[in-house]
Amino acid sequence: MSSSREENVYLAKLAEQAERYEEMVEFMEKVAKTVDTDELTVEERNLLSVAYKNVIGARRASWRIISSIEQKEESRGNDDHVSIIKDYRGKIETELSKICDGILNLLDSHLVPTASLAESKVFYLKMKGDYHRYLAEFKTGAERKEAAESTLVAYKSAQDIALADLAPTHPIRLGLALNFSVFYYEILNSPDRACSLAKQAFDEAISELDTLGEESYKDSTLIMQLLRDNLTLWNSDINDEAGGDEIKEASKHEPEEGKPAETGQ
C-alpha cells in the first residue's frame, strides 16, 4: 500500500465484508481526518456513510423495539418492568448520542468545510441533517427542539444547493427529498408538507427520467420507488389515520423493515 489513507480504505472494505461496522467507522474516520484540503473520493464518502448508517441503524432499531415494549408494559401497569426498561433505553440513547456526536463533529470540522463540489456539499449537509434527525427521534424537551431545528437548517441548506445545481433525477437530490419529507412527517408531524415535498421530487424526476444516465439509473429509480411508497402510506394515514406501516428512508442498502423509507446516501 502506498499510503496509510489507502490502507485504511482497504481495511474499511474488509470490515464491511466482515460486518464489523464499528471498526469500519474507525478506519474511515482516520481517512477523513487526514484530508485537510482535498475532498474524500466518492468511494471514500460512500464507505464513511455506509459505516455510520450501519452503526446507527442497529441502535435505532434497538431503541424502537425497547420503546414499543415500554409502551406495552406501561399500558399493563407493570411499573417495575417499566423502570428497568427506562434504564436500559437510556443506555441505548447514550450510544445513539455518542455516534451522532461523532459524525456531526467530523462533518463540521472536516467534511463540510472541504467540500467544493455541489454534489459533495449536498451529500454532507444531508448527512448532517440525517444525524440531527436521529437525535430528534429520541431526545425530549429543549434538546429535541434544538435537534429538530438543526435538522431543518441542514436539510434546507442542502436543498438550496440541490435545487440549483443537481438534476431532479440525481440520486443525492432524490435521497435528500426522501429524508427531508420523512423529517416533516415523523419529527414535525406535518404530513401535508411531507407529501408535498415527496410528490414534487417524484414528479420532477419522472418528467426528466429520459435524461437519466445508466450509471445512476438503478439508485435513482429505487429512491423514486421509496418516495412513492411513502406517499401511498402517508396518504392512507391522512385519510384513515390508521398508521402502523413502515416509512422508507434513503439508504445505500435496502430500507429497514417496518418504518418509513429513508436514505443513508
Curated annotation (Swiss-Prot):
- Answer whether the UniProt record assigns the keyword Nucleotidyltransferase to this protein: no
Q: Which residues cross the membrane?
A: none
What the entry lists under SMART domains is as follows: 14_3_3 (SM00101)
Q: Where is the composition biased (Basic and acidic residues)?
A: 245-265
Positions carrying Phosphoserine: S67, S109, S190
| Cited InterPro entries | 14-3-3, 14-3-3_CS, 14-3-3_dom_sf, 14-3-3_domain
* Top-level taxon in the UniProt lineage: Eukaryota
Q: Keywords in alphabetical order, please.
A: Cytoplasm, Nucleus, Phosphoprotein
Q: Where in the cell is it found?
A: Nucleus; Cytoplasm
- Which residues in this protein are found as Phosphothreonine? T211
The keyword Membrane is annotated on this UniProt entry = no
- Name the GO cellular-component terms: cytosol; Golgi apparatus; nucleus; plasma membrane; plasmodesma
Which residues does the annotated region (Disordered) include?
A: 242-265
Report the family membership.
Belongs to the 14-3-3 family.
On subunit structure and binding partners, the annotation says: Component of the SERK1 signaling complex, composed of KAPP, CDC48A, GRF6 or GRF7, SERK1, SERK2, SERK3/BAK1 and BRI1. Interacts with DREB1A and DREB1B in the nucleus. Interacts with CINV1.
As for what it does, the entry says: Is associated with a DNA binding complex that binds to the G box, a well-characterized cis-acting DNA regulatory element found in plant genes.
Q: What is this protein called?
A: 14-3-3-like protein GF14 nu
Chain's gene name = GRF7
